[in-house]
Amino acid sequence: MLFCDDSKKYLKEQNINLKNEFDKDDKRVEKFSLKHQNIYFDYSKNLINDYILKSLLESAEKSSLKDKIKQMFNGAKINSTEHRAVLHTALRDLSSTPLIVDGQDIRQEVTKEKQRVKELVEKVVSGRWRGFSGKKITDIVNIGIGGSDLGPKMVVRALQPYHCTDLKVHFVSNVDADSLLQALHVVDPETTLFIIASKSFSTEETLLNSISAREWLLDHYEDEKAVANHFVAISSKLDKVKEFGIDLEHCYKMWDWVGGRYSLWSSIGMSIAFAIGYDNFEKLLAGAYSVDKHFKETEFSKNIPVIMALLASYYSCTYNSQSQALLPYDERLCYFVDYLQQADMESNGKSVNIAGETVNYQTGVVLWGGVGTNGQHAFHQLLHQGNIFIPVDFIAIATSHHNYDNHQQALLANCFAQSQALMFGQSYDMVYNELLKSGLNETQAKELAAHKVIPGNRPSTTILLDELSPYSLGALIALYEHKIFVQGVLWDINSYDQWGVELGKKLGKNILKAMNDDSSDEYQNLDDSTRQLIAKVKNK
């Protein structure tokens, strides 16, 4: 059954008024909220009632969602265009039941690789791994891009209070040399360990940064043997890793059944373990696993990722929402939006269904946002008074890691106030009367009142965590991962390929050749606009 059918449009005719819904139903919050361990999920401020939710859940039941969930967890190749299983969940699975993919029990492989990463982390932290000059490693530089950067960087920042190893962890991603230089300016070649995170070991940005880092190291040591003491790799291309000068004992696996944007649970998360210690890294995995079990075993009406996906898909299909705002009210989550942008938009930014047919309904949306309270002084104006339909997710943490309780209370008060303001707004009469009370005369009040009206009735969800710990962060990430999966099923698209990024890479290589040789075929085949841009650069 197609989720985005005409029946969803009729649901909009329920004309939900949130204020009225709360006034007439004192059980609304109880009905439209869920709890998973230390995560409270309040979706009562969404444009739904019992009838709409029942209809959405029926659509989920009639879809292939239950079967697709089983297929994913059992290792079926649901990434149909690349003929791959989708098993990032296996990386955090604490069960011992065999899981066979292409004739091999991958649980054994995963366990073995985890042990290798653990041994490396403990070796570096303890000082048993030394730089070429014999000095202890003090800094880790992770060189990667996309999923090899966004996830680990987000987690390392979010869990800063749990840093316990005395290692400073840096991230380099952009091909712009400034990204690399920012790291190199603050590290010592004798005490730095580089992680090259690239499945193909040929990703342009990662390879160029790695080569430059290698040159920087050798400028200091003037001995090729130094590379083995200062570089490890996460890749499936052993020949290229060896050619670079890295000992193959220090090359860690990336499997085809783990997509880059879901890879922080794998060896790609090595930089996380270097920062927070391997025991805390395992707690991150355990938190995600708890949500995997919740997602796999819980009926849809009480299943948080399913409800998240149904609401988002409903707004997309029925209200034509083209974006979603994600507003974490915690500075530690300052990279969370960046991370989820890739996870969501690269997964569901598709225009054909599984069969390769162009769809006639909207799929992925633009996910954007930023940390509170900063956003209140930047883009919240659009959320409150703009005429674009934008559902909002608020993420709040009940307790902080610091002792500034007055700061934390103010932060949470602002978060809850924003969701309340989106829901209730303020009417013309309310504003007009307030202006009269403030001392304005009737003419002045009438002139200003229309500008201060806030329509309200704008949907939001609040996700409240007891604390931001490795365990709870793992759970939070997994909630959104599974939400993305469910939306892909509802829209009948493949959430696990990303063919849209390939053309730009191909053209970028051609243009680079053209920039270096204006007699080349690549230059001759350029359009006039691109040729002029190249000319402008060369003339500077």
Swiss-Prot record:
Keywords: Cytoplasm, Gluconeogenesis, Glycolysis, Isomerase. GO terms for biological process: gluconeogenesis; glucose 6-phosphate metabolic process; glycolytic process. The keyword Cytoplasm applies. One of its GO terms (cellular component) is cytosol. It catalyses: alpha-D-glucose 6-phosphate = beta-D-fructose 6-phosphate. Its EC number is 5.3.1.9. Signal peptide: none annotated. This is Glucose-6-phosphate isomerase. It comes from Francisella tularensis subsp. tularensis (strain SCHU S4 / Schu 4).
